[in-house]
Amino acid sequence: MTTFGHDTWWLVAAKAIAVFVFLMLTVLVAILAERKLLGRMQLRPGPNRVGPKGALQSLADGIKLALKESITPGGIDRFVYFVAPIISVIPAFTAFAFIPFGPEVSVFGHRTPLQITDLPVAVLFILGLSAIGVYGIVLGGWASGSTYPLLGGVRSTAQVISYEVAMGLSFATVFLMAGTMSTSQIVAAQDGVWYAFLLLPSFVIYLISMVGETNRAPFDLPEAEGELVAGFHTEYSSLKFAMFMLAEYVNMTTVSALAATLFFGGWHAPWPLNMWASANTGWWPLIWFTAKVWGFLFIYFWLRATLPRLRYDQFMALGWKLLIPVSLVWVMVAAIIRSLRNQGYQYWTPTLVFSSIVVAAAMVLLLRKPLSAPGARASARQRGDEGTSPEPAFPTPPLLAGATKENAGG
């Protein structure tokens, strides 16, 4: 923490511009990579018209959206309608100020860390900024004056509230083991072993929560095309729609960078590259960090291409009935092991690893259990009393048994 606060103004400005350029380039490449990967998985070429093999397609789409006519629907709250995309974008970019890209380097004779700033509670600050971004979504849905955007905004609010609880609990074990909430110090604490191995349940819970937090498939319920047209941004077009899309991909990059920081050693080189003496010095760590971020972005693309969208009740059941209870149990286990470590217990590392494997295996077994009971529902249909089944049938209200029989007979 003592290395921050001593940079000259031009160095801080240069780092801020570098982070902005990094995020913009990452978004452009991520959109193209996602479309190419989806095309490959669906046995089609993907974008291949603009530039060599479609390499400039994302840039062309951005220019197209910026130059399109801005259509404003009638009967809206104009101020909130126009401010909502800005509220979504600003927190997404701001959160990256606390992400460490690398160690101290020399820039024109000045020693400076590859990080804009840090705080004793930096991770909590990032968590708060991610929560602020949902205000732009819900305000955009409410200000549009239409039913589908409003439903999408309400869904997004419930989604973020539900999964931020599980995400915060996954952070708690990291804080316990590292003894700090500073991102740079958490990276320093993983110099030996990454927390993805020591705190496996926290990593799995965070991995699921970060997909739900960013409204991505299979948790893209706020913009479910088959139910809500386009969700909260149905009434947005031109540059305002592009800002919502930009915020989504920047948020994906932010949570991916946070996953690399908290669980994958941040900018530390992976094995066996860490055996090289210069792997964690100079500008090399920037390459390792970027590779880790892109690894998590690939998980996003892979999930979108392979998994169907969950129903809303299944999604909420996953968060409240599985992730949060398992997180609470795991926090207590990690706290006990941390207490034993403080009292001089020598075998705390193998004990923690064994506990991680046990809790993670239990969570996987619980994940294999269906979130709804299709067998019970099928037997209820055969008996003709589906309406009296205790299983919820969201979003369609259950029919009365008599009405079901009449419809079957008619």
UniProtKB/Swiss-Prot annotation:
Disulfide bonds: none annotated. It is found in: Cell membrane. One of its GO terms (biological process) is aerobic respiration. HAMAP family: NDH1_NuoH. It is an enzyme of class 7 (translocase). GO terms for molecular function: NADH dehydrogenase activity; oxidoreductase activity, acting on NAD(P)H, quinone or similar compound as acceptor; quinone binding. This is NADH-quinone oxidoreductase subunit H. Pfam families: NADHdh. InterPro entries: NADH_UbQ_OxRdtase_su1/FPO, NADH_UbQ_OxRdtase_su1_CS. It comes from the Bacteria. Its EC number is 7.1.1.-. It comes from Mycobacterium tuberculosis (strain ATCC 25177 / H37Ra). NDH-1 shuttles electrons from NADH, via FMN and iron-sulfur (Fe-S) centers, to quinones in the respiratory chain. The immediate electron acceptor for the enzyme in this species is believed to be menaquinone. Couples the redox reaction to proton translocation (for every two electrons transferred, four hydrogen ions are translocated across the cytoplasmic membrane), and thus conserves the redox energy in a proton gradient. This subunit may bind ubiquinone.
